[in-house]
Structure formats: C-alpha cells, structure tokens
Amino acid sequence: MYAVFQSGGKQHRVSEGQTIRLEKLDIATGEAVEFDQILMIANGEDIKIGVPYVDGGKIKAEVVAHGRGEKIKIVKFRRRKHHRKQQGHRQWFTDVKITGISA
C-alpha cells in the first residue's frame, strides 16, 4: 500500500514504515502528526484518486528529527566592476516516519 500526499508545497509518495524528509514542521520531536491532503491511495488493484483530495484519507506519522540541510552558495558577480557578492543558505527540514495509511 502506498499513498501520495502534499506537504510544504511538494508531493511525496510514501508507504508504511518509510522515513521521509519534509519542509520544516513546527511539531516537537517524538510527537505524532497527521496529514489529510491525500492525493492518491493505492492498495494493490484498489486505487483511489482524489478530486483534489481523497475523502477520509489520512496518513499518520511520527516526527523523528529536525535539522538543516547542506549549505548552498549563492554568488552574484559583475564582470569588470570589482563587484562580487557571496551568500550561503541552509534549509530547515523535518524527518518523519510513516506509521499508518488509511483510506
């Protein structure tokens, strides 16, 4: 059984027991979270597609950890002008473990 849900403006395909990295959620580590924006649920040959969301579909998960991603560098450069601007960014994330999928 797997499902496709929406969180943080992105779509994720998950199955039970899977750990997935999402955009930062304001929920403490170890607490349960429930996603209700389910786009599709598939259980073998039985497939439910939402318009836009599946009625009564829920994904239960547990927050495993919070952290920051790898640093990326942003460089702005103007040729021949002795102008260079450099900036770094590290995006916050939340790791969640999927504990249950229900239709």
From Swiss-Prot:
Biological processes, Gene Ontology terms: translation
GO molecular function, one term: rRNA binding
Domain of life: Bacteria
Swiss-Prot/TrEMBL keywords: Ribonucleoprotein, Ribosomal protein, RNA-binding, rRNA-binding
Pfam families per record: Ribosomal_L21p
Cellular component GO terms held in the UniProt record: cytoplasm; ribonucleoprotein complex; ribosome
Protein family: Belongs to the bacterial ribosomal protein bL21 family.
Function summary: This protein binds to 23S rRNA in the presence of protein L20.
Subunit structure: Part of the 50S ribosomal subunit. Contacts protein L20.
PANTHER family: 50S RIBOSOMAL PROTEIN L21, LARGE RIBOSOMAL SUBUNIT PROTEIN BL21M
Protein name: Large ribosomal subunit protein bL21
Gene behind the chain: rplU
